[in-house]
């Protein structure tokens, strides 16, 4: 069908001019048809000025048409070689615009990177302050509530109770009445009871070691 359509188109052209159909007419007519979607429109406009391949006159009209129909893509590539460089220039400009857009995007990313780095630096500063505060708190806590501090405090309280009981014993000479004696016994027993309880705690502590949490 394509062969017949091509020949009819050529006959119509030559009929108007009073000329015969030649194989070159077939090739030019075939090259003058609308190209495939991937080929620019300028290929069709400039095809009449495209030189024919060398040795094309050795082929018959049917062979030429079959060759064109079978290898149409190669024909389009051949035609493309003779197009002006405007298409390539347009592509170059398009690529240049794309690169320019990428450059702008990169600058935006660079600014965002600087902001993120600033935030990270602030986070590092906060982390350093937190670590310093935690170390101070831990040190203060250990001084007041650590095993060593608690044991030392217990030892001091035990020693203080022993001293209080010794001082209380010195007041026995000043006891004049039964009521004073009862009060003395009550106070003395209370102090000595607390003293022995704390001594027992210290002994247990020394035996079992530091407290386990």
Swiss-Prot record:
Any one GO CC term of the record: endosome
Principal location: cytoplasm
Chain coiled-coil ranges: none
Gene: SRN2
GO BP: any one term: protein targeting to vacuole
Function: Component of the ESCRT-I complex, a regulator of vesicular trafficking process. Required for normal endocytic and biosynthetic traffic to the yeast vacuole.
Substitution effect: residue 102 to D: Defective in ESCRT-I cargo sorting
Family statement drawn from the similarity comment of this UniProt entry: Belongs to the VPS37 family.
Oligomeric form and interacting partners: Component of the ESCRT-I complex (endosomal sorting complex required for transport I) which consists of STP22, VPS28, SRN2 and MVB12 in a 1:1:1:1 stoichiometry. Interacts with STP22 and MVB12.
Keywords annotated in UniProt: Cytoplasm, Endosome, Membrane, Protein transport, Transport
Protein name from the UniProt record: Protein SRN2
Protein's cellular compartments: Cytoplasm; Endosome; Late endosome membrane
Record-linked Pfam families: Mod_r
Residue stretches making up the VPS37 C-terminal domain: 128-213
Disulfide cross-links: none
Membrane topology listed for this record: Peripheral membrane protein
Domain of life of the native organism: Eukaryota
Phenotype upon changing residue 185 to R: Abolishes ESCRT-I complex assembly; class E phenotype (malformed late MVB)
């Amino acid at each position: 069908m394509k062969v017949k359509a091509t020949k009819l188109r050529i006959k119509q052209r030559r009929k108007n001019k009073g000329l015969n159909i030649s194989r070159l007419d077939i090739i030019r007519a075939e090259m003058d048809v609308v190209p495939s979607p991937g080929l620019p429109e300028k290929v069709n406009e400039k095809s009449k000025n495209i030189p024919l391949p060398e040795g094309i006159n050795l082929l018959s009209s049917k062979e030429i048409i079959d060759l064109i129909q079978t290898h149409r893509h190669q024909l389009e590539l051949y035609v493309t070689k003779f197009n002006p460089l405007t298409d390539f220039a347009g592509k170059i400009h398009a690529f240049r615009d794309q690169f320019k857009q990428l450059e702008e995007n990169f600058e935006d990313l660079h600014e965002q990177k600087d902001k993120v780095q600033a935030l990270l630096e602030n986070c590092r500063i906060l982390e350093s302050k937190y670590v310093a505060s935690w170390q101070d708190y831990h040190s203060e806590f250990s001084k007041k509530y650590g095993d060593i501090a608690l044991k030392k405090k217990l030892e001091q309280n035990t020693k203080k109770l022993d001293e209080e009981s010794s001082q209380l014993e010195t007041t026995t000479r000043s006891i004049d009445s039964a009521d004073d004696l009862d009060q003395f016994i009550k106070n003395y027993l209370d102090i000595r009871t607390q003293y022995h309880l704390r001594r027992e705690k210290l002994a247990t502590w020394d035996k079992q070691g530091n407290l386990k949490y």
